[in-house]
Amino acid sequence: MSPGSRGRPRQRLEDRGLMKPPSLSKRRLLPRVQFLPLLLLALAMGLAFYIVWNSWHPGVEEMSRSRDLRVPLIGSLSEAKLRLVVGQLDPQRLWGTFLRPLLIVRPPGSSGNLQVRKFLEATLQSLSAGWHVELDPFTASTPLGPLDFGNVVATLDPGAARHLTLACHYDSKFFPPGLPPFVGATDSAVPCALLLELVQALDAMLSRIKQQAAPVTLQLLFLDGEEALKEWGPKDSLYGSRHLAQIMESIPHSPGPTRIQAIELFVLLDLLGASSPIFFSHFPRTARWFQRLRSIEKRLHRLNLLQSHPQEVMYFQPGEPPGPVEDDHIPFLRRGVPVLHLIATPFPAVWHTPADTEANLHPPTVHNLSRILAVFLAEYLGL
């Protein structure tokens, strides 16, 4: 098994490139004497229109009619607003309220899995922003026989046209009885706790944009059955994401046609919590958003807002990843959804071992990631 392969069969998926606009057809130029006055007049009219338009529509960002992504607003948060956003995060709440209840054995179909699912549902329903929480229960055939699974889907404003979707899996890998317990702290209790802390910390800000009926809303997916139950393969892995992507592809959504098309950006978190993680951009289509995360990390470092974070330990790195990784983004990627995959590569040393516990997490790294992601959300959603 080579580093970064996650012990799973490699499968290269071509990232859908953006179509280049057709070139304008050439037209005969007017004679120079007639052309210059007309050019000056056109420039004057264009400038006047631009001034009037911006006075009526301040800060409006032009959106593509295709599924292209928006251009990120570099440095769109003032330092005061950035500090305000970061100040809403509570490391003790993240760790004690959200992370520790997840650190139990929770493979699909187990009592621990159901306990965590109910905890996620109750936590999301308690937020003052008024999230729309849906359960996606289903039964699937597995190498262990039929098992019950359940995804948790939370959408801030179901009526919004587009979704920024953050996702992680909440199940832990199944190990046969008699082996040491596996609680999957990095895989993926910490990602789940990060999402809960983010929406709790930004609750008031998210409530405001919901009341304003913003065109882009936040959506969270807590997916079940990511791990293989026996041996990784197309039928023994990604149970929850495969089921949910298929369901979302069939549910109508305005302006349409379905919920899967409403996902403007799918951000998947996995294998987080060990010290000095390294992240790479996995898809050219979302490289601009990866660059945004790099810029945010550098800015927070310059402002001395990251802990145990020397200049030489930058999480978000340029260059190519060690190799493709199959994860819960695959069913969505295959349906044309833009994916930003935030997975530590190489994988943590404790990956798929009983040592993937709270004791081997690095709290400063977890809190640093919460700050980077909080600023990213605030910029993307215009909080």
Curated annotation (Swiss-Prot):
Q: Name one GO molecular function term.
A: glutaminyl-peptide cyclotransferase activity
**Keywords assigned by UniProt, alphabetized:** Acyltransferase, Disulfide bond, Golgi apparatus, Membrane, Metal-binding, Transferase, Transmembrane, Transmembrane helix, Zinc
Q: Where is the signal peptide?
A: none
Main location per the UniProt record = Golgi
Q: Where is the active site?
A: 226, 270
The portions of this protein that span the membrane are 33-53
Spell out the Pfam families in the cross-references. Answer: Peptidase_M28 (PF04389)
EC number(s) reported in the record: 2.3.2.5
Give compartment(s).
Answer: Golgi apparatus membrane
What this protein is called in its record is Glutaminyl-peptide cyclotransferase-like protein
Q: Which organism is it from?
A: Mus musculus
Tell me the name of the encoding gene.
Answer: Qpctl
